[in-house]
Swiss-Prot record:
Superkingdom, natural source: Eukaryota
Subcellular location: Nucleus
Biased composition annotated in UniProt, kind: Basic residues: 925-944, 991-1004
Residue spans of biased composition, Polar residues class: 910-924, 1339-1349
Name of encoding gene: Kat6b
MYST-type HAT domain residues: 533-807
Protein name: Histone acetyltransferase KAT6B
Region Disordered, residue ranges: 70-103, 168-207, 361-417, 846-1018, 1031-1252, 1283-1358, 1388-1418
Amino acid sequence: MVKLANPLYTEWILEAVQKIKKQKQRPSEERICHAVSTSHGLDKKTVSEQLELSVQDGSVLKVTNKGLASYKDPDNPGRFSSVKPGTFPKPTKGSKGPPCNDLRNVDWNKLLKRAIEGLEEPNGSSLKNIEKYLRSQSDLTGTTNHPAFQQRLRLGAKRAVNNGRLLKEGPQYRVNSGSSDGKGAPQYPSAFPSSLPPVSLLPHEKDQPRADPIPICSFCLGTKESNREKKPEELLSCADCGSSGHPSCLKFCPELTANVKALRWQCIECKTCSACRVQGKNADNMLFCDSCDRGFHMECCDPPLSRMPKGMWICQVCRPKKKGRKLLHEKAAQIKRRYAKPIGRPKNKLKQRLLSVTSDEGSMSAFTGRGSPGRGQKTKVSTTPSSGHAASGKHSSSRLAVTDPTRPGATTKTTTSSTYISASTLKVNKKTKGLIDGLTKFFTPSPDGRRSRGEIIDFSKHYRPRKKVSQKQSCTSHVLATDTDIKISIKQESADVSLVGNKELVTEEDLDVFKQAQELSWEKIECESGVEDCGRYPSVIEFGKYEIQTWYSSPYPQEYARLPKLYLCEFCLKYMKSKNILLRHSKKCGWFHPPANEIYRRKDLSVFEVDGNMSKIYCQNLCLLAKLFLDHKTLYYDVEPFLFYVLTKNDEKGCHLVGYFSKEKLCQQKYNVSCIMIMPQHQRQGFGRFLIDFSYLLSRREGQAGSPEKPLSDLGRLSYLAYWKSVILEYLYRHHERHISIKAISRATGMCPHDIATTLQHLHMIDRRDGRFVIIRREKLILGHMEKLKNCSRPNELDPESLRWTPMLISNAVVSEEEREAEKEAERLMEQASCWEKEEQEILSSRVSSRQSSAKVQSKNKYLHSPERRPVAGERGQLLELSKESSEEEEEEEEEDDEEEEEEEEEESIQTSPPRLTKPQSVSIKRKRPFVVKKKRGRKRRRINSSVTTETISETTEVLNEPFDNSDEERPMPQLEPTCEIPVEEGGRKPVLRKAFPHQPGKKRQTEEEEGEDNHFFKTAALCRKDVDDDAEHLKEGSKDNPEPLKCRQVWPKGAKRGLSKWKQSKERKTGFKLNLYTPPETPMEPEDQVTIEEQKELSEDKGSPVGMEREVTETVDALLPQEGSRREETGIPVSPHKSPGGKVDEEDLIRGEEEGEEEGEEEGEREEQEEEEEVTTEKDLDGAKSKENPEPEISMEKEDPVHLGDHEEDEDEEEEPSHNEDHDADDEDDGHMEAANMERGDLPRETFKDALEGQEAFLDLSIQPSHSNPEVLMNCGVDLTMSCNSEPKELAGDTGTAPESDAEPPEEQTQKQDQKNSDGVDAELEEGGPAAVEIDSETAQAVQSLTQENREHDDTFPDCAETQEACRSLQNYTHTDQSPQIATTLDECQQSDHSSPVSSVHSHPGQSVRSVNSPSVPALENSYAQISPDQTAITVPPLQNMETSPMMDVPSVSDHSQQVVDSGFSDLGSIESTTENYENPSSYDSTMGGSICGNGSSQNSCSYSSLTSSNLTQNSCAVTQQMSNISGSCSMLQQTSISSPPTCSVKSPQGCVVERPPSSSQQLAQCSMAANFTPPMQLADIPETSNANIGLYERMGQSDFGAGHYPQPSATFSLAKLQQLTNTLIDHSLPYSHSAAVTSYANSASLSTPLSNTGLVQLSQSPHSVPGGPQAQATMTPPPNLTPPPMNLPPPLLQRNMAASNIGISHSQRLQTQIASKGHVSMRTKAASLSPAAATHQSQIYGRSQTVAMQGPARTLTMQRGMNMSVNLMPAPAYNVNSVNMNMNTLNAMNGYSMSQPMMNSGYHSNHGYMNQTPQYPMQMQMGMMGSQPYAQQPMQTPPHANMMYTAPGHHGYMNTGMSKQSLNGSYMRR
């Protein structure tokens, strides 16, 4: 026979089958294909084809069960590969895997017999002796040497005993010679030829006709010439149907075969009971004789049997008559009596009895043959369809569930496979009889002997009998046994037929008893005996007062599913078998409503939010119930990741289930419904629409667009389409404005743009005109719909006011009510703006007016429900942001058309009146800001709670709310308020902030640009905040005057991955989860960041009511397309708009700028707006974190327009975030990631990293901005510090205008920065900065919030709070006074001057490219690190120094060098996307994260940690400015060999630092130190070029040291003392650890680490608690934001912070010494360390010090202060801690001279796995830098985002790993 399949492939397939079975899995086609392709490299398509051919060949057996096809090895069909059919070595079944192939054909029975007989032991032989004997046989060496021999031998012996071949007495085995009663009769006559009695035909068998034999074996399809083993073998043919089979396939032994040939043999389908001779009756209870293969009903046996006998069974015909019949009769009578009475008898016996007798009810007959093991025991699955049973009236055809297909009567037979079942299979195992009552599903085991061949055929078609058949008809229903092998078919026969057996044996009395028992059993389960087999299990349920027919089967446990009726408790949904059980349960069940919180109640309807993780059983039961009415539902048991919103109708009895929908807690695609179901009795009453509406309400409250999980079922599609149509028509009916955008609709309705676009297409309301998409209003359609609605109002309408619900921890989605309100207003404004062209025009004419009008619009557009719209806002923002050029259509392909046209419209309107949109937004923001501020705080807190530190935030919700959720927003609110200066600006600028926020969503690019121009500080802050502020910022913005900020937050960066686990991990960092790097851009539901961005953008647009509206409509479509372009445009555009020296450009101008470039102007306008906002309010500083998103663009602006810096930075921060996110989504994954990382998003590793990188970039970009962003973070720690920092920089920015820039950076530096920035980084900055700001904002904000929370908690709730805040304030005041103004001014000036690149301002060394600025390692010294803008890419940084400069630099591309290593190590994100813009973004991340990891550590730190105020502000102003300078020359800070002159640094202030690139390092120290004490000294001209970058980072850490006071608030968790201890230890170790000399080596690290430790550590260690150690306080508070940025670039920034902490902990001189040891630069740091009493106090706290040495190597920014990393761990704030851990590891690594531990980096990322991976890159690079390219396996620290773990990051090198474990520093810190 020619084989169709390639024999080699067939062999591979069989191997795969064995392999899969060995893994205890079903050999499905998919698994087989996978296994073969994996092991042999064959492509799956070929495998699939070969598998089919092999099945056709017969070399592979295909078995269908429950509709699923499985494949078996015909030679080894059993569970274990069994022996070839011919041999009986059934025992071989157990053989596993390929090695079994050798043992496959071994006949274990023969071997055992040979051994036992050979040993000739009288009492039998032990298995050990048998094994020894067999091993001694030379001819068996091949078998005995097999590794599985012993196991297989034992298995063979066991099976032989079970089959009766061997007898086992104790441990001895002996051959069974057969027992008197036949039970022991040998199974294989061959073994005991005399055992089987001779057979003879019975009288009724003679002269019967015989059917023509079919010459093909029904099992192997072979012929008599070729059986399965390709050997000739005679066929046995059925006398009735002619079906044939090989004895080997039937598993007949030779003796049985000989006997059967002499008799009239019947196959299993035709088998007739030889006693009652009724064919087909009760076939399930038929036994097959192992001697003649005749069939007997158990009740027909003599004596009748109640259960299947075990082992061999010989019928009464063959059984020798022994001791007369009397004995048998007596025994039979006993058995009869014992089992006749149903009452006391065991259940299964009764069942069996019932089965055998009950014909009406339908007895269960097991097809599994009862025969000898050798016989085909395969269970026959009866394939008769339920209807078939009834249909076939003939008893003969229906007698067996499985009828021979060949017979005409066998309608029941579904599969032909039944034909192939051997006769033995037919034999029913009497044991299988089960109760028909269905109470339990019985698995009928076939006799052991016959089990081997369990081939189940087509189980899928057999279900438990449900059909009621007329009594006369014997219908067999099929019950699938739990065991796949056995199918039980229930034979329904009339009761009278059931007893056709040996009548003399079954008396009438017995029959009556049986029938009575049967009836009782049926009553108990309350179902008629003949239940129809409807194919649904269960077919009916009793639920409450309803009896409901099910629609589909549900996977209830078999014993329940097989019941005709299931009883469910309507409250707890528990399922029960009978009414009695239900009644008993209902008395005990104390549930009257779902086990969850009621989040909605109106009239008699309630909705409960059930957490699948909390109420697992309830949710599983709910899913099982839902499956009864849903066709395509696959999830029943894995309910933990879901929330179930259960709708109930309430009365006095309880809350009765109406329906529910489930929702994934963290869904990347932002699906708001996974499964939705309404109970049948409540359908057609509007509840489905109610739940759909409710799901969208939740999405709106979360501030993001939602969409049901795709694909939708048919019913779901209908329901949703109807809902979408009605919602859109009603929206259009309410909004008659000329410009309507998909974005606006999305924001108002919560629908995702794709669904809106689809629906508009269905409504034929979208068209393409002039190459643009436009929405066509079909008034008739709209009015017709409204008429229908009026005529028949909806019965169950949702009332949003009745919802009492706070969004989950989802950082981006979480929006507090206040935030929602703020968002609502903003959205309303937006709506108005988009709705009312007139207003837009007015706004265009008068921007101020437009602002006012936008405010008006807000109130007018209440319908929009900004909170509700918020979800969509992000997406809309996307659309708006998208410009035609951007072709963001790709991102949302489905939305593409609609969005495009809408966007185009929006764009047109925007172009037409660009200023309007921007201006109204700003105006509305300003207006709203005051009232929204509080709201924002609340929102922020919520966000914080969910994303960063839920507990901490909750406790200090009020205080932490703003800072945590939106670092930027929060910072202005709390910090601004506390800081006198800030509050003043706050009042003026808050509106701007809001405006910026809205802008962000609407004009991400603008925001970026503005941020880049205005908000160098903010950029840093924004980056930090962006993560934290993504939420906080959005919240803030929303609260301030636009919900958009919230939306922005909620929206994930497009590329960012949103993971619940991650979110959960950093619940507190929830806000920071903006880095949805993994979400594909085209996902309609963009990452929350993206949505947030879009929403913010739109909100900002909305804020400008006229313009907002116009923008909405036109921009929505345009934005979608141009989003990328916009962002890029922003990058480019900022230069012109931001260039204006009057950075403060009129709001109108700013607005105009925005409006001018919805695509390009949008960027500018937003920047301007942001600048304005910054001017208007220090709050903008809070936004600054966001602005970090566009820090680079802002930097450009700032450089050019120092005045704009203050306002703009904040504004930009806000706006940038959305833009950034969006861009980040599409183009700048890095940006988003950096933002997220800055935000302290451990949960979104990638995004976090990106965010962090971006944040750092932003920090780098904006030296001043970092100051702002840090203040934002600091806000948590101490608002005062942040405020002072923010306000001072702003004031300076505003007052000084360009002065700050020059201050921040010497003209040369500025020029360098500018040149670099302009050349490389302007665009990149804008692009990169924006995204970084956005994402970092959330994370940073969260981190800050966690710290702030703790600080606030300390202030509000905890005793530490006052301390921390005091420390913070002292630091803030100190820093503020000394550095803040100076730095702010300088920074601003520098930044603006270096308009090109924030980094540029800090860029002290021309060698460092602008990219460096963006690169994470350059955060503080942005310009030093050539800013790594998306354009430039971090790798571009030409000088090693640049790379080094930014330890946080996420420049995987830099992996080749220590510098590059540093860069990539900077952020996980960066690592991941090291070569591309990501690195640039990481640079932003860097600054945000590490507060400029390399040089910008302090600035970044300040941004990150509000607590860093003093030192941080010193850092911030000085450091921020310095950061700018340092960032510009990131190496500068690191390089500051003259770290020993920290005071100089302070004195130096940003300007000095900036001017003196090399000294910049010392400056950074000063910054870090918080006090001006060390500002000037920090400048180390000596370490100019090479060290500059590295020092920037490390110096910053050193500065942190100097600002030891910052550490005071290690977050409530850490005590100052502990921090100090850690710091001291760390510092001590740190110094030795980092060798200043090696850029690649640790020498440089030391120097770098010193500055870093000053800068970064301060931030990290700065805790709001420590007033005396203001820097410490700052550090603690700062850490969260910093941490946030560090998450990606965390190692450097964190290291910086840690170092700072370390330095702080150690005396400044000490630090200096350490650093000096590392490098000359470091020495200055030590001085700085002695910065302030606080510093001294917190020296130990600031363990970051040790890290100071970490990155000293100028070229080795990479050295990220490893020691510092440890110090960070001290931070109590969870997010903060995580970051600190990262920093610690980095610092430690640097210090140790080992590689930076990935954990440091990772922990910074909130255990973001993705970022952790990235971290490894960076740490590796860093390590290389520190250790001379000694890569260390980065062990991801994966500490929970909020875990306050010193050692969260395990270093590769002991102490490094522990974060400080090996270093003494580590040890002391560990005890934190």
